[in-house]
Amino acid sequence: MAFVEHDPQGQANAAAFVEGLGALNWKEGSNLRIDWRWGDSDPTLMEHYAAELVALSPDLLLAGSSSLATDVLRRRTGKIPIVFANVTDPVGQGFVASLGHPGGNVTGFSNYDPVMVSKWLGMLTQLTPPVANVAALYNPATTPYAALLLHAIEEAAPSLSVTVRAATVKDDAEIELVMAGLAREERSGLLVLPDIFTSGHRDSIIALAARYQVPAVYPFRSFVAAGGLMFYGIETSETFRRATGYVDRILKGAMPADLPVQTPVNFKTVVNLRTAKALGFTIPPALLVAADEVIE
């Protein structure tokens, strides 16, 4: 319910979900009906669609790829099972009592592991020239879990000899101010936090990073495919495919309260050599060897 309908990543997630269900013998038009809603990264639209979906009295709700989608659905119903596919801090946001024992009508798949944060910073420090000053870009209105990520970033920074700061934004103009400020600093770089705002403003962020020659690590592979520099994290389409296992179990009688929240299993590194060259940075051989995908 969070993605833009025509976004390639949103379509890949939807396809993986349908394929995963098919492998479990759930076929649309036969024994399954799926009512799709695309929130287009718009909180107001997502509230509207949440009300629509709950009014349909479905057997299950899939909160597709954002904490906000999970929250708006959870506030609408305490009875219909909800499976989330991409939430950063389900305990901190009150979606579940604990990862091991959710205890309510909500469970699903987290997109966060503490190792990710040190990896993000490490990728920036491995560049030539290395980055030493990092801004973490996000919109506080749509990133209620920002404190968790910022705390982890601040804890990882000293061991990498990096200084970090929060860069809060709410529109393209403020994104440009952040980029312009980083361009005036020496050895500066950017972490783009996972957030429906940053996903919705992906093209602007990438274009401004290119204009101001700011190296950045992005939260999803789709950013690097669209011209961003580097990505480390999970493939969201894989998480949607994994989510079908819980959907299958719940439709067969399992209770969300009894299904532990699953954490990431596989991580991928993607680098864009073309973008590195345009920005004036060199990707070290060790990082290229470790990368799962190199865009040339």
Residue ranges and their predicted role:
Residues 1-296:
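Short hydrophobic alpha-helices and adjacent helix-cap/hinge residues
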